[in-house]
Amino acid sequence: MDSITQIVLGAACGEAVLGKKIGNKALLFGAIGGTIPDLDVFIGQFLYGNEIQAMAFHRGFMHSLLFAVLGCFLFGWLTYHLYNTGKRLGTTTLKNWILLFFWSIFTHPILDSFTPYGTQLFAPFSDYRVAFNNISVADP
């Protein structure tokens, strides 16, 4: 799925979870969360010497349901401690941030699974790519 769609969906998740507490900043944090799984493109290029292995790494573990669960705690905890300082102290809870990152990260691989390329939703337990193949993707 294209990055714009993932950013907008992540922003919508951020607004739904924290919009009333932190306003438009929730859109930004949700958009960041919505793009986190696609950082595997850069990680794959760093880890592997050739482009084929790097592309095979894409839509792997960082697009799995397990990563959504683990990642939401990591990014939620980190953001909670960085955001809740000074005047903003006490405006949000750790649970708010974990939920924001869970929904923004979780929706990313679900949306990607509707494309013909598929997504390894069950990685690292299975390398099967779930692909519903009902949204066409036009890659430039």
Residue spans for each PLM region:
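N-terminal membrane-targeting hydrophobic helices
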Residues: 1-140
